[in-house]
Amino acid sequence: MRKYLNYLVVIFLISSCASESETQTQIIETTSTTASTTSSSTSTTIQDVKEDISYDEFGIELLDVTPEMKEQFDELIEFVEKKTGLSFVEYPKFNLYTLDGYRDYNAASYLDDFDKDYEEGEWERAVLSQNMWGLNNSSPEELKELIVEFQRCASAGSYNLLDQILRVPIKRNQIKLNLWEQSIVVHELVHSLQGQIVDLSDWYTTMKESDDFMDYPGRRSVMEAQADLVQAYWEANLDPYDRQDMSSQRPNFRCSVSLPTYFYIPFDLYYDFGGRLGKQIH
């Protein structure tokens, strides 16, 4: 299962976005009446309304950033820089999805990585070996589907170590980001800043080439500690009403999918010990 864990290390693999245009046909009824009160004529005019929609490399829709959202991003970037004492080298890259789109991206990017990592028959042999050792009784396809479903619901936002893009799900047709979305953006902006200050892409590539990820959990916990701390600072500025409002805006991120116990992912280290360590350092 090392290859699957490696996928979790990088968070998500390389992605890009492309723009396409979709044309919607709109029917407009127009009525014209002649000078005579006894006769009238009705005509139908067909107009083509073009709507530009952006997609990522998996064909998943990307939501547009409104001018108001751009202002919010600018303010959040300034906040992150102030709290960390560091400055962004360049404007951070980000993709905004609907919640379903974000989950579809997580699944699609994992499957894309899966197809690249496993040679024909390799996955089946690995699962058969697990069956023989009594680790699980799932078929290769069943275990693969379980992992895909876990990927779909396992995160509220993400930052990619390789392409340096942060990805956050938001509600469609919003003018501004709500409080919950802003809080997630703050957390991921810290990771984006970390990626600009430290060459995390090279760090990951070196680990993968040497097949040695022993240092990853400790470093990841420190990275999460800093992101959690800055996020907590931002939320501390909210009054009780806003806190309640933010809580109500939180999507249902409950993940009912559980991976087999031998898929050890030290979330307690990342989000518990790391946070306590960060507070002690601070």
Q: For each of these PLM feature ranges, what is it?
A:
Residues L13-S16:
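C-terminal motif of bacterial Sec signal peptides marking the signal peptidase cleavage site
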Residues A18-E20:
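Bacterial signal peptide processing site
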Residues T23-Q47:
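Extracellular mucin-like PTS domains
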Residues L76, Q196-Q249:
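Post-HExxH zinc-binding segment in Zn-dependent metallohydrolases
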Residues Y102-A126, S139-L166, I175:
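Catalytic zinc-binding patch centered on the HExxH motif and its immediate surroundings
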Residues C153, L166-V186, G218:
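Short pre-active-site segment immediately N-terminal to the catalytic Zn-binding motif
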Residues A236-H282:
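Long, well-structured alpha-helical subdomains associated
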